[in-house]
């Protein structure tokens, strides 16, 4: 099954997954009047802005509890887009972000961010071939104090992910999560009856549940086949 079809099937089937106990408190006036919270928000968007104005005008910012899937073929710029957006959120809006990189190391991501922010040559940055002025410029980069938390745990399971999100939310009140990328996650348990497509669908369902539990948007990068 093509990855595109799998994602569409997941989105259609979210409601059909096992129901959770009803924990709604109907005595809460704000739950009956959700617009009151938005009315108190004086910013242009009631979600987390991406920093890309054309996109934010459509989405009104990434909304709490949303699961956003960004899918594209290999080498189309998914990570570059996610990093650019992360930079905007953490520096321009000072909102804490948790970035889970299952492919690249935290060091590689930091180098890419520094190169993009400073305009320095990426290769020179990696090799340490910098002038004293360039080193001083890096030391004063706004990225050094940005509320960005990178986790590069490989083959991350859903259980591990939830535990890390809970810790980040409690300690740093993160406002958004990025996962790079979906196909490198796992459920943490082996089921011979479940094929790869079913496992991906189950992971997505679990991620949606986590987004709702912690009331924050989760952005998932997903690779699709070049044949799609």
Outline where the language-model segments fall:
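Accessory, often N-terminal, substrate/partner-engagement and coupling regions
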Residues: 1-21
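The Walker A/P-loop phosphate-binding site
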Residues: 15-120
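Cytosolic-facing regulatory segments adjacent to core modules
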Residues: 57, 88-173, 187
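Short, contiguous acidic/charged loop-to-helix segments that flank catalytic cores in large enzymes
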Residues: 73, 153, 185-202, 228
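Conserved nucleotide-binding/hydrolysis micro-motifs of P-loop NTPases
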Residues: 75, 104-107, 154-157, 182-185, ...
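Substrate-engagement module of ASCE P-loop NTPases
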Residues: 88-91, 198-220
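C-terminal regions of RecA-like/P-loop NTPase motor modules
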Residues: 158-174, 191, 205-214, 226-228
């Amino acid at each position: 099954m093509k990855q595109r079809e799998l994602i569409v099937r997941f989105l259609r089937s979210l409601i059909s997954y096992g129901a959770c106990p009803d924990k709604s408190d109907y005595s809460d006036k704000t739950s009956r009047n959700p617009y009151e919270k938005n009315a108190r928000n004086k910013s242009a968007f009631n979600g987390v802005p991406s920093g890309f104005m054309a996109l934010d005008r459509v989405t009104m910012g990434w909304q709490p509890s949303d699961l956003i899937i960004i899918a594209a073929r290999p080498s189309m710029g998914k990570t570059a887009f996610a990093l650019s957006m992360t930079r905007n959120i953490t520096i321009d809006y000072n909102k804490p972000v948790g970035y889970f990189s299952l492919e690249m190391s935290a060091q590689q991501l930091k180098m890419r961010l520094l190169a993009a922010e400073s305009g320095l040559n990426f290769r020179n940055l990696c090799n340490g071939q910098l002038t004293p002025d360039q080193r001083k410029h890096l030391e004063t980069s706004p990225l050094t104090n940005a509320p960005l938390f990178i986790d590069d745990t490989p083959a991350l399971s859903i259980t591990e992910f939830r535990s890390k999100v809970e810790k980040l939310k409690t300690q740093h009140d993160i406002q958004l999560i990025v996962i790079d990328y979906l196909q490198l996650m796992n459920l943490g348990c082996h089921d011979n009856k479940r094929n790869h497509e079913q496992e991906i669908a189950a992971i997505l369902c679990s991620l949606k549940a986590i987004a709702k539990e912690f009331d924050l948007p989760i952005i998932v990068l997903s690779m699709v086949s070049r044949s799609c």
